[in-house]
């Protein structure tokens, strides 16, 4: 292989994509620098020389953001990047999922794929560059990877599909679809959409796959030019004699145990068989390696039998039909002091979702590589160990929890009211209380119930369902509402969320090489039937969002002021706005266009704050009449407060109709008097007159007297 830098280029969505090899990170097994527009991502792949003594494939994928990529210096005291952002974690998962199925069963060498984002052009996706770079780094390396794969982002504008849309195009698009796969089939889908029909989503997936084929052909050319010969590795295999002996000892009893319908009873029955076999080999003083192989064989017996029952006999572990959904139960308003709550139960999967409404100042501030600076809608997913009857340390959210939370967020965001119609920050927290598969979709259903209970005026309710697939040769079975065992031992986890009108989110992970269009189409249609069944159940519990918000939710008043007056409301160093907040206990958020949001639980305090702000921004107009209060008396006149923060001077000559010798003869401090604005000078000083109003009143009285005289004269005639 040549050690000189080599450059390969292709056009991708009207922008140049360039791959540079053999210059950077040469000690990694494989490394490429991907340039897409002005985006630059360094992707590397490294593998251990020897297999690890573990019973799984130790693959780690890292998508590393560097703030220098967008010309930022990290905040905080340390001034360096800390833990990965949510976006970086989701990007790592996005790359991991299509790559993982393409390593051989039994491969136990540790593999680490790292993509460092070094420069960002917002119109050229760094995630797509990293996915391509990760695939290519593995493909040109000596690591036995059965790729390459590629990914593409698909948008839809005015009914037309667009590959890798720009930021401006994304704002106009009614879907954001990421699809990845090999040249033969799709193996990963991640999508958010604005209630798009299933048929359209399928067309978008296939449209993206056409672009994937082109990118894979491009990668194959690069591999042909600079790729290393793949290392021959020994795959993990169990001893053939041991395999036969264990199967003879355990298969019959294990097959019976698998068909126990209830989850915990089934797990106990399987454990009894496993324990008996392992104790037999422990009694024979088998070493750790042999005992590990025995566990592996027992696992394979379970997997093979579950798959055979589903594909051949069409029997699921819990006795359901392929398209049957577990029993449903829902409840709302179960937590009195929260703003909204929804409990959703599907079989032995249960999620309790809580909705909290906050002011717009409660938005989440984003400090990453994207153009978004904040978001007003959040969905957080928690998966405590007690939900599966286990014990483990309680730590912060892992990649899985962050991924499931983001999926729910993506599914629900399209049906949220606009900020103009509902000026609240919305936070959802989904607590998984029981788990037997499909918890992410249960959290979506629970969150819909919680928002409806909270009075959030959703455009439409959303439900989610997880589909599964078990494929053996030409035989396959698509499963509706998969449980934990079917997810773990099956070939697909296909989550579909949406309304009665269409899809709002998709997520698909495949453990086999990929799926055909026909299977995808069948899965989508079967998911729609299941989703509608769940939606109907949810609507029987709460048919529409509550009209009134919770008494414990903040009340928000919206008002508009002249943008030039924003500085007056805020005051020097925030002095004025902080004074209002301290006096009323409200939260105040001001937009650049002059929109003001005032929020608190106490509506009376909201109104008080609004009145204060109205007085601050109110402008004095020549000719207007005010009832003001005398604040100060001088020899030359009286200063009158027209409203909060606005004073004017009534000169001594303008106090009365007659000549006034002393101001105190007419008014004193604290008196309320009516005055008229007669002038605002160049310095902004307001000159007032009481005399003008007295004269006008005198003239009105004179006019009344004259009219009365004329009326009397007419009567006498």
From Swiss-Prot:
- For this protein, what reaction is catalysed? RNA(n+1) + phosphate = RNA(n) + a ribonucleoside 5'-diphosphate
What is the E.C. number?
2.7.7.8
Cross-referenced PROSITE patterns: KH_TYPE_1 (PS50084), S1 (PS50126)
Q: Identify its protein family.
A: Belongs to the polyribonucleotide nucleotidyltransferase family.
Entry binding sites for Mg(2+): 487, 493
Q: What is its main location?
A: cytoplasm
Question: Sorted alphabetically, which PANTHER family does this protein's record hold?
Answer: POLYRIBONUCLEOTIDE NUCLEOTIDYLTRANSFERASE, POLYRIBONUCLEOTIDE NUCLEOTIDYLTRANSFERASE 1, MITOCHONDRIAL
Q: Which cofactor does it need?
A: Mg(2+)
Concerning Pfam families, the annotation shows: KH_1 (PF00013), PNPase (PF03726), RNase_PH (PF01138), RNase_PH_C (PF03725), S1 (PF00575)
Chain's role: Involved in mRNA degradation. Catalyzes the phosphorolysis of single-stranded polyribonucleotides processively in the 3'- to 5'-direction.
Annotated SMART domains: KH (SM00322), S1 (SM00316)
Sorted UniProt keywords: Cytoplasm, Magnesium, Metal-binding, Nucleotidyltransferase, RNA-binding, Transferase
Q: What is this protein called?
A: Polyribonucleotide nucleotidyltransferase
Identify the residues that the record assigns to the KH domain, covering every copy. 554-613
Q: Which domain of life is it from?
A: Bacteria
GO BP, sorted A to Z: mRNA catabolic process; RNA processing
Localisation per UniProt entry: Cytoplasm
């Amino acid at each position: 292989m040549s050690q000189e830098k080599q450059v390969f280029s292709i056009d991708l969505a009207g922008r140049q994509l360039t791959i540079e090899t053999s210059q950077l990170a040469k000690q990694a097994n494989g490394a490429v620098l991907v340039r897409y527009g002005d985006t630059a991502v360094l992707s590397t792949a490294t593998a251990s020389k020897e297999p690890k003594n573990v019973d799984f494939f130790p693959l780690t994928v890292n998508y590393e953001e560097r703030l220098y990529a967008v010309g930022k210096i990290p905040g905080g005291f340390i001034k360096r990047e800390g833990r990965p952002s949510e976006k970086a974690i989701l990007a790592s998962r996005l790359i991991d999922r299509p790559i993982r199925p393409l390593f051989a069963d039994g491969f136990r060498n540790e593999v680490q794929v790292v993509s460092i984002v070094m420069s960002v052009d917002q119109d050229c996706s760094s995630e797509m560059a990293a996915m391509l770079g990760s695939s290519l780094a593995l493909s040109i390396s000596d690591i036995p990877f059965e790729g390459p794969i590629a990914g593409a982002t698909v948008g839809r504008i005015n009914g037309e599909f667009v590959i890798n849309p720009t930021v401006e195009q994304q704002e106009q698009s009614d879907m954001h679809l990421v699809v990845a796969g090999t040249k033969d089939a799709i193996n990963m889908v991640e999508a958010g959409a604005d209630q798009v029909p299933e048929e359209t989503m399928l067309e978008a997936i296939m449209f993206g796959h056409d672009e994937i084929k082109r990118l894979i052909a491009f990668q194959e050319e690069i591999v042909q030019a600079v790729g290393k010969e793949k290392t021959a590795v020994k795959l993990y295999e169990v001893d053939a004699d041991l395999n036969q002996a264990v199967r003879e000892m355990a298969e019959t009893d294990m097959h019976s145990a698998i068909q126990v319908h209830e989850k915990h009873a089934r797990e106990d029955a399987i454990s009894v068989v496993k324990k008996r076999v392992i104790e037999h080999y422990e009694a024979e003083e088998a070493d750790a390696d042999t005992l590990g192989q025995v566990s592996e064989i027992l696992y394979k017996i379970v997997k093979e039998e579950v798959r055979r029952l589903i594909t051949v006999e069409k029997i699921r572990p819990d006795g359901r039909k392929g398209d049957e959904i577990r029993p449903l139960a829902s409840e709302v308003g179960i937590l009195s002091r929260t703003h909204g709550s929804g409990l959703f139960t599907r079989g032995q999967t249960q999620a309790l979702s809580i909705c909290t409404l906050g002011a717009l100042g409660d938005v989440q501030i984003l400090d990453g590589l994207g153009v978004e600076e904040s978001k007003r809608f959040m969905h957080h997913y928690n998966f405590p160990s007690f939900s599966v009857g286990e014990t483990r340390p309680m730590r912060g959210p892992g990649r899985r929890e962050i991924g499931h939370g983001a999926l729910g967020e993506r599914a629900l965001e399209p049906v949220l009211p606009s900020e103009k119609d509902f000026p609240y920050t919305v936070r959802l927290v989904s607590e998984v209380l029981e788990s037997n598969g499909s918890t992410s979709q249960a959290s979506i259903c629970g969150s819909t119930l919680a928002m409806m209970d909270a009075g959030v005026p959703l455009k439409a309710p959303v439900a989610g369902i997880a589909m599964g697939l078990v494929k053996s040769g030409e035989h396959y079975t698509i499963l509706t509402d998969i449980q934990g065992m079917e997810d773990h031992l099956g070939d697909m986890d296909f989550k579909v969320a949406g309304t009665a009108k269409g899809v709002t989110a998709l997520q698909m992970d495949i453990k086999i090489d990929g799926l055909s269009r026909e299977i995808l189409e069948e899965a989508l249609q079967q998911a729609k039937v299941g989703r509608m069944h769940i939606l109907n159940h949810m609507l029987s519990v709460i048919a529409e969002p509550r009209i009134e918000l919770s008494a414990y939710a903040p009340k928000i008043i919206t008002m508009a002021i002249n943008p030039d007056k924003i500085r007056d409301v805020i005051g020097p160093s925030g002095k004025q706005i902080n004074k209002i907040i301290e006096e009323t206990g409200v939260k105040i958020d001001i937009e650049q266009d002059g929109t003001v949001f005032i929020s608190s639980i106490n509506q009376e305090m909201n109104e008080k704050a609004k009145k204060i702000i109205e007085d601050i921004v109110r402008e004095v107009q020549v000719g207007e009449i005010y009832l003001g209060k005398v604040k100060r008396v001088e020899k030359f006149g009286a200063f009158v407060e027209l409203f909060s923060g606005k004073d004017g001077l009534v000169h001594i000559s303008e106090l009365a109709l007659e000549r006034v010798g002393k101001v105190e003869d007419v008014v004193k401090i604290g008196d309320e008097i009516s005055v008229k604005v007669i002038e605002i000078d160049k310095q902004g000083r307001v000159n007032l007159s009481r005399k003008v109003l007295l004269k006008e009143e005198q003239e009105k009285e004179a006019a009344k007297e004259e009219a009365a005289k004329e009326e009397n004269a007419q009567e006498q005639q």
